[in-house]
C-alpha cells in the first residue's frame, strides 16, 4: 500500500512537472488593423460565405467613421459655434431653451437679491418707501421682471426706479448680455436651418456603376442628376478609389485613397447639371482599373467614392453630395437607359429610368489585355508591309544590276567589232 501511494505521488509530480514545462508563454504582439488581420492566412472551409465589404462612405453620403478615444475634447469648446451647429436638432433645441432659461433665472436671482438686501421686501405696504423695482414682492416677480428686461417686451406692472444705481447698472449688463445671447443663439439656429445639407438630398446618384465600351475604349460610368428646377452653379464632380494596399517594404496602408480621373484635364469634370449626366472614366494605363478584368472584379475589395460639389443658386452656399459604389454595385457589360426625350418644344426627363441599365456586348478582358491584343494584331500587319517594301526595293536593285551588266556586255561587244574592222 505504501509503494502504491509512493508510485501515485511520483506520477502526479511528473504530470505537474510536464504541465509546468509545456505551459505556453504569453507573448504580446502589436495589434494589427482589422483589414490586415483579415488578410492573414487562415484555415477556412470552402463553403465559407464571402466576407462583406465594409463601406467607407454610405450610399446616402454619410461617412461610416467613428472617432474614439478623443482626449482633447476642449478643442470642441474652442469652436463652440460649429459644435452647436453640428449637434442634432433635439440637442440643439434643448440647449436653446436651457440657455435662455438659465440667463433669465440668473438675472432674476440677482434682482431678487438686490431687493432683499435693500429691504424692499420689508416695505412692500409702505407707500413712502421707494424700492429698486416697484411691485417686486418675491422671486417669481423678480424672474418675470428679468424676462421683461431681456426680451424687451416693455415694462408694465413692474418698473425700475431712479433711486437704485445698482439696479441701473444691472439693467445695462443684462441688456448687453441678452443681446449677445440673442445674436449667438438665433444665429446658430439660422445657420442650422439654412445649411445646404438638405439641398444635397435632391442630388441623386445611380444605384450602380457600369463598365462598358465607349468610343472603342473601356470606361467606368455612373449617372448623376438634380431633381430641383433651381440648378447647382459651378458644379464639379470628382471620384476616389478607396482600397487598402501593402507597400514593397511591407507597410500596410488601410483605406488608401487614389484619384480617379473623370475629366480633370479636359474640363469634363465641370458640369452643367440641368439634366442627368453620365460621368465617364476612361480605363487607361494611369487608371487604377487597368489590370482588372470581369472575372477579377468581384474578388477585389474596393470602393469608389464620388463627390459632387457646387453652389446653391438660391443662397450661394456651397453644397456637397456624396455616394459610393462597392464591387457588387459595379456592373460589367451594361449601359444606362436613356432618360431624356424630346417633346413638343421641351426636353423631358424620365426619372423612373434613372437607375435602369441594359446589357451590352463588352469584352471580359481587362483594359491592359485588350491593349496587348490590339498591339499584337498590329504587329504582323506592319511587318508584312515593311517586308514587302524591302522585297520590292531588293528586286529593283537586282534589276538595275542586271541592266548594268547587260549594258557593259553590249559595250564590250561593240568595241571588239570596231577593233576587228580596223584590222
From Swiss-Prot:
Domain of life of the organism encoding this protein = Eukaryota
Q: Which reaction does it catalyse?
A: K(+)(in) = K(+)(out)
Entry-annotated residues carrying Phosphoserine: 16, 23
The record places the motif (PDZ-binding) at: 420-423
Q: In which tissues is it expressed?
A: Most abundant in cerebellum, and to a lesser degree in islets and exocrine pancreas.
Write out the ranges of the annotated region (Disordered).
390-423
Q: List the ranges annotated as motif Selectivity filter.
A: 152-157
Q: How does it sit in the membrane?
A: Multi-pass membrane protein
Q: Does the keyword ATP-binding apply?
A: no
The protein's matches in PANTHER family, at most eight in alphabetical order, are given as:
G PROTEIN-ACTIVATED INWARD RECTIFIER POTASSIUM CHANNEL 2, INWARD RECTIFIER POTASSIUM CHANNEL
Oligomeric form and interacting partners? Associates with KCNJ3/GIRK1 or KCNJ5/GRIK4 to form a G-protein-activated heteromultimer pore-forming unit. The resulting inward current is much larger. Interacts (via PDZ-binding motif) with SNX27 (via PDZ domain); the interaction is required when endocytosed to prevent degradation in lysosomes and promote recycling to the plasma membrane.
This protein is called G protein-activated inward rectifier potassium channel 2
Chain's gene name: KCNJ6
